[in-house]
Curated annotation (Swiss-Prot):
It is found in: Cytoplasm. GO terms for cellular component: cytosol. The gene is trmD. It comes from Nostoc punctiforme (strain ATCC 29133 / PCC 73102). Its EC number is 2.1.1.228. Specifically methylates guanosine-37 in various tRNAs. This is tRNA (guanine-N(1)-)-methyltransferase. Belongs to the RNA methyltransferase TrmD family. It holds the Pfam family tRNA_m1G_MT. Coiled coil: none annotated. Its main location: cytoplasm.
């Protein structure tokens, strides 16, 4: 998959792109990331990318021309999505990440800055995406999260496929508690069932822990899971 990141601050991506699973995926050419600075597409001597909003207001807006020209300079793959990182967008979740990795070969990710972008930029994008209901100084950090989440779902990035299918959110539940050696650390003991070797009992314990943790911390996920089950039963005519 190809990622084209339109950002005023390309240097801030360097450490992220060269470390961990993402760095390995790029080294193996499972994915490729290209950084594009809209400032390189300005036509004035000051290379200005922002201006005051019409009608007045606080702060500056990113101008449309450099963003449009930057995106139009990119190669176009058949299955391309142009994403604006915006607090007004669809919140990133596992379902969205799976949709993107399944349906697209190229993601163009535009990182806003200042007080946002000129509204006409929305005529260029095909989707707005958000990291959550809070404001950051720019779209770079949300873009990093999006790229990381998508790349790890590309086959070949994660060594064990079961690591993806068994992890939190894939089943609609939070993850169960996990432990490693030592079995007793400062009086904090690993639950006996995990040391029993009884795989059926371990599986049952883990499922119960998932239900309990999700009920305590994210009851909304349980509601969605139940609604999905009811919808499936309805579709089946039961």
């Amino acid at each position: 998959m190809r990622f084209d990141i339109v950002t005023l601050f390309p240097d801030c991506f360097n450490s992220v792109l060269n470390s961990g699973l993402l760095g390995k995926a790029l080294a193996k050419q499972i994915a490729e990331v290209h950084l594009v600075n809209p400032r390189d597409f300005t036509t004035d001597k000051h290379r200005k990318v922002d201006d005051e909003p019409y009608g007045g207001g606080v702060g500056m807006l990113m101008k449309p021309e450099p963003i449009f020209t930057a995106v139009e300079s990119l190669p176009v793959l058949p299955r391309r999505e142009i994403i604006l990182m915006s607090p007004q967008g669809q919140t990133i979740n596992q379902s969205l990440l799976k949709e993107l990795v399944t349906n697209y070969d190229q993601l163009v990710v535009i990182c806003g800055h200042y007080e946002g972008v000129d509204e006409r930029v929305l005529h260029l994008v095909t989707r707005e995406v958000s990291l959550g209901d809070f404001i950051l100084t720019g779209g770079e950090i949300p873009a990093m999260a999006l790229i990381n989440g998508v790349v790890r779902l590309i086959p070949g990035t994660v060594a064990k496929t079961e690591s993806l299918t068994a992890e939190s959110f894939e089943e609609g539940l939070l993850d169960y508690p996990q432990y490693t050696r030592p079995a007793n650390f400062r009086g904090l003991k690993v639950p006996d069932v995990l040391l029993s070797g009884n795989h059926a009992a371990i599986a049952q314990w883990r499922y119960e822990q998932q239900i309990q943790k999700t009920r305590d911390r994210r009851p909304d996920l349980l509601e969605k899971l139940e609604q999905g089950k009811q919808g499936s039963r309805g579709a089946g005519g039961e």
